[in-house]
Amino acid sequence: MREQSGRSLIEIIGVLAIGAIMVSGTYAIYNTTNQKQKRLIASETLKDIATKTKTLLEYSGYQNVSIDFLIESGAINSNKSPAGNQDWSITSNVDGTEFSINLNGLSFDECAYFTTKKMDWTTHISVNGFDSSATSYCLKTGDNKISFYAK
């Protein structure tokens, strides 16, 4: 009988399979951590925008609030959206006593995160035009719109 030297094909496939599992697990952990970090940064950015808007316009009313106004006043650095696509806005209600930060193009997961996270700076949240804090109005197809209202 001949003696074997080296590894068998089964052993090599087993080692490669273990390596593939480790790589895919690492990728999944990275993705989860990355998404969580992006959402935390977006949350803090929204809070910062709301705080600076209140500081600038609380006593004079929010009628003229806009992204361009906040950039010109130095409250925010750019018109880059904190989350979702780049189609976002800051608007006031009719009498100027309240303003909203409107984010468009949010995925279902982002929508669910922002509607379930407690944000003490908001008076209420609107999801796809419905006033609610429940995720039941988040569309699974994506392209969700959330408005955060503050006074």
Label for each model-derived stretch:
Residues 1-34, 42:
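N-terminal single-pass transmembrane signal-anchor helix
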Residues 10-19, 53-65:
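Charged, low-complexity, helix/coiled-coil-prone segments
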Residues 58-151:
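Periplasmic/extracellular, small/polar-rich flexible segments of pilin-like filament-forming proteins
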Residues 24, 32, 51, 113-116:
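Generic detector of well-ordered secondary structure
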Residues 33-36, 94:
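A generic structural signal for solvent-exposed, polar alpha-helical segments
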